[in-house]
Curated annotation (Swiss-Prot):
Family listed: Belongs to the class-I aminoacyl-tRNA synthetase family.
Reaction(s) catalysed by this chain's protein: tRNA(Leu) + L-leucine + ATP = L-leucyl-tRNA(Leu) + AMP + diphosphate
Record key words, sorted: Aminoacyl-tRNA synthetase, ATP-binding, Cytoplasm, Ligase, Nucleotide-binding, Protein biosynthesis
Gene behind the chain: leuS
Protein name: Leucine--tRNA ligase
Superkingdom of the source species: Bacteria
Motif 'KMSKS' region per UniProt: ranges: 580-584
Length: 804
């Protein structure tokens, strides 16, 4: 007899909700804060790929509850975002209404899966009660000099009508396009809010060392921050100083030209009049190229000589000044000293434009750039020195002669923090008639979005909010002000949402971050103990969240400077065709359909059993069928067998061994192998005689199964005569003494040669060993045609059959 998943799921979901089974407790000194990367509530809803990560955190949360931990396992909604705004533009509907509808659909889907979220902790980043604190944190950043309004080169997307951050852009066919919609993106100078994350570069680097994160993610962040130690050397062109950052100042005697990024503010100042038109055309051409294309070393180099020269401060040689797209303005000073003999890109450029090449590091092969280690040559006082020696000497020389200075440089850029959108957090900022910035008082927060039909982009670079004049214009006393009309990026809210869950008393009801109660809660729950989500957030959300946590820690508001103690990146679930799930491929699997046909427990079990949690694997309906088949086997086992309260000890070894292994495997997030162990236990139980299976062992099995199949496990727990939720039970213990295996392996030999082995209980007598050897299939093949056999048996060791 199989179980009815539809009846069971409804029954127990109702029970969990009515009895508030998953409410966060505050009874233990042990805590476990287990967190999903919260979803953006899109209109498409969830697919089975989303379910994988959520199931993993749910399994671990249930495990920790049963181990006696207070568990915080919340859910919320990253609700601001461009998709809702685009929907509103197409339909004329308010994006807030659209978002709330999507949230309700998401909640229905999540509840169907039996996830153990505490909905009293639910948050919505687009709710004013939430973004009141987002606005307050921005104010603190501004007060500490970490938020600035400045004119900068930005990534402008005309189609979306907004500025995009670097992590919101991808490269396609050599051009910059928006990640969402793949619309063209160009560089444009605009006045924007930025957060000075660069001030925290060293703290963010140092903090990575002690995090239990995948090395790949930590390395991505290290490379994104990109710390390099070097020297900034001043080259002069007439009276204009050109600062050049380099990590290889020791090669300065090999500099044969200088290259500026086309965006460098010195370009037009240095360009000769006769070259101005050509230079401007090249600058315009470069603006449409992606950073990825510009960094591509394999492509043909392009550039323009600007008609001016600079002086090498050491050799006093006059060298040409060029602009080229292979030099980026946002690294160093946006200028390089070109040493073509020892840099491949410089070599390719020099070869293309027939520029001089001078070797200053000894090499036998001067037919290509030499980038290895060697002794310096053609370098005056650096001759015969190796790289490390030469760097020390040249840095001292530059310092002593005021030719530059030692400098640490970072690839990390300040965080572009404003968007020309309607649907985002308003800034708590006013401008007076002289354009001075005035912060809105705390007691006037939150500043909410207006109810308006004017949400179309202005196409002037301003936010749609600029159209809402009765919102923009503010009068306080006899003074008139204008509101900031840009809104914050979606990444603002996600930079502190893990804190918001702790502050939540009930849905979207947050206590003050600065209160004594907040301090008490934060000290208990932070940092997050396990955070599961995709690696694609490595240099976006994960970096920004670390920055805000470090900042709030420095304000004395948090007990830790790192938000996420342990991070795990789950793999993707691919379509049955082994491609990424996509509507365009037609390979998306809807969990609602799977739940209808197979049930939530089968879906949960299958996704955790299909392979290692961090592996990306294709969806298989055969695997799903097998999971349901096994759950039915578990159901039949408990309905079929009458259990005993007396232990006959036959299952002692396998039960205790399985409990020990499953406990360790769950802790290590090896869910697929944990499920395999449960299958081992079920097989062992089926081999036992009816009415002899020890009931506490069956109960221990159901407890372990409940992590993966909570609905069925509740039903089985009730069937065993229990009247409380299996979720609230303690995790099964194992007896180490029962795992000492009372068995030995006996070697079976024929004429002294090993032909087979058997496993028997220790102390098995000689007669039994000989009988088992005679029945062994491999041994039979060797002795079947012989009659004169002599058997030599040694207890616990060997049986040797001698053919006479």
């Amino acid at each position: 007899m199989d179980f009815s998943h539809k009846a069971i799921e409804k029954k127990w979901q109702k029970y969990w909700k009515e009895n508030n089974i998953y409410k966060t407790t505050n009874n233990s000194e042990k805590k476990a804060y287990i967190l999903d990367m919260f979803p953006y509530p899109s209109g498409a809803g969830l697919h089975v790929g989303h379910i994988k990560g959520y199931t993993a955190t749910d399994v671990y949360s249930r495990f920790k509850r049963m181990q006696g931990y207070d568990v915080l396992h919340p859910i919320g909604w990253d609700a601001f975002g461009l998709p809702a705004e685009q929907y509103a533009l197409k339909t004329g509907n308010d994006p807030r209404e659209f978002t709330l509808q999507n949230i309700e659909n998401f909640k229905i889907q999540l509840n169907k899966m039996g996830f153990s979220y505490d909905y009293d902790k639910e948050i919505n980043t687009a709710d004013p009660n939430y973004y009141k604190t987002t606005q307050w944190i921005f104010k603190q950043l501004y007060k500490k000099g970490l938020a600035e309004n400045r004119d900068i080169d930005v990534n402008w997307c005309q189609e979306l009508g907004t500025v995009l951050a670097n992590d919101e852009i991808i490269e396609k066919d050599g051009l910059m396009v928006s990640e969402r919609g793949e619309y063209p993106v160009v560089k444009k100078k605009m006045r924007q809010w930025v957060l000075k994350i660069t001030d925290y570069a060293d703290k963010l680097l140092d903090g990575l060392d002690n995090l239990d994160w995948p090395n790949s993610v930590k390395e991505l962040q290290r490379n994104w921050i990109g710390k390099s130690e070097g020297c900034e050397i001043n080259f002069k062109s007439n009276d204009i100083n050109i600062p050049v950052f380099t990590t290889r100042a020791d090669t300065i005697f090999g500099v044969t030209y200088i290259v500026l990024a086309s965006e460098n503010e010195l370009v037009l100042k240095l360009t000769a009049p006769e070259k101005l038109e050509e230079v401007k055309k090249y600058i315009e051409l470069t603006a449409n190229k992606s950073e990825i294309e510009r960094k591509d070393e394999s492509r043909t180099k392009t550039g323009v000589f600007i008609g001016s020269y600079a002086t090498n401060p050491l050799t006093k040689e006059q060298i040409q000044i060029w602009i080229s797209d292979y030099v980026l303005n946002d690294y160093g000073s946006g200028a390089i000293m070109a040493v073509p003999a020892h840099d491949k890109r410089d070599w390719d450029f020099a070869a293309k434009f027939n520029l001089p090449i001078k070797f200053v590091i000894q090499t036998k092969d001067q037919s290509k750039a030499f980038v290895g280690e060697g002794i310096h040559i053609n370098s005056e006082f650096l001759n015969d020195l190796d790289r490390i020696q030469a760097l020390q000497v040249i840095h001292d020389y530059v310092d002593k002669n005021n030719l530059g200075k030692r400098k640490i440089n970072y690839k990390l850029r300040d965080w572009l923090f404003s968007r020309q959108r309607f649907y985002g957090e308003p800034f708590p900022v006013l401008y007076d008639k002289d354009n001075n910035i005035v912060l809105i008082e705390d007691n006037n927060l939150p500043i909410t979005l207006p109810i308006t039909d004017y949400i179309k982009p202005t196409n002037t670079g301003e936010s749609p909010l600029a159209n809402v004049k009765n919102w923009v214009n503010v009068k306080i006393g006899d003074k008139e002000y204008k509101r900031e009309t840009n809104t914050m990026p979606q990444s603002a809210a996600s930079s502190w949402y893990f804190i918001a869950y702790i502050l939540a008393n009930s849905k979207n009801n947050l206590i003050d971050l600065t209160s004594d109660e907040a301090k008490k809660r934060l000290e208990k729950w932070l940092p997050v103990d396990l955070y599961i989500g995709g690696q694609e957030h490595a240099v976006g959300h994960l970096l920004y969240a670390r920055f805000w946590t470090h900042f709030l820690y420095d304000l004395g508001l948090l007990p830790t400077n790192e938000p996420f103690k342990r991070l795990f990146n789950q793999g993707m679930i691919l379509g049955p065709d082994n491609r990424k799930m996509s509507k365009s491929w037609g390979n998306v699997i809807n969990p609602d359909d799977v739940i209808d046909t197979h049930g939530a427990d089968a879906l949960r079990l299958y996704e955790m059993f299909m392979g290692p949690l961090d592996a990306s694997l294709p969806w298989s309906f055969d695997g799903l069928d097998a999971s349901l088949k096994w759950l039915n086997r578990c159901y039949r086992m408990i309905n079929k067998i009458e259990f005993s309260n007396t232990n006959n000890h036959k299952l002692d070894y396998v039960y205790n061994d399985v409990v020990k292994k499953v406990t360790q495997m769950i802790q290590e997030l090896k869910f697929n192998t944990a499920i395999s162990q449960l299958m081992v236990l079920v097989n062992a139980i089926y081999k036992e005689e009816l009415n002899t299976v020890y009931k506490p062992y069956i109960e221990g099995f159901v407890k372990m199964l409940s992590l993966f199949a909570p609905h069925l496990s509740e039903e089985l727990w009730e069937k065993l005569g229990n009247n409380s939720s299996v979720t609230l039970q303690t995790w099964p213990e194992f007896d180490e003494t029962k795992i000492i295996k009372n068995a030995v392996v006996i070697a079976l030999q024929v004429n002294g040669k090993l032909r087979s082995t058997i496993e028997v209980e220790k102390g098995t007598d000689k007669e039994t060993l000989i009988k088992l050897a005679q029945e062994n299939e491999n041994i039979i093949r060797f002795i079947k045609d012989h009659k004169n056999l002599k058997y030599i048996a040694v207890v616990d060791r060997i049986v040797n059959i001698v053919i006479e």
